[in-house]
Amino acid sequence: FGWGKNRAALKAKKAAYEAEVHSYEKSVLEAFKETRNAIVNFNKIKEVYELRANLERSAKSYMDLAQLQYINGVINYLDVLDAQRGYFDAQIGLSNAIRDELIAVVQLYKALGGGWEQNP
């Protein structure tokens, strides 16, 4: 007989098994958390994109209106330049929102486990 060797080995195997189960559960929970965070982030960034797109359209309309008013002598050229600056700022904001949205899509895709290769 093994004087308790077998029993000690069984306890060690059970402890190792429970540690692996705990590690697996922790990994699964972390994956769900990353996925949820990526989805929330994507939705927020999509809202920002929509707001920036609306702002860009409004700034374009304002710039067009300012140009017409200048042509008709209602406003001076500095007002047109100010409207153009606002439009260009809105375009930059929209470009940044598009970039952020694309980055969020990649992060979501990675969180879902897609397209990741360690050694391409």
Give, region by region, the residue ranges found by the protein language model.
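Outer-membrane beta-barrel channels and translocator barrels
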Residues: F1-G2, F32
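Short loop/turn motifs that connect adjacent beta-strands in outer-membrane beta-barrel proteins
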Residues: W3-R7
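Amphipathic alpha-helical coiled-coil segments
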Residues: A8-G93, D100-A111
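Terminal intrinsically disordered/low-complexity segments used for targeting and assembly
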Residues: A111-P120
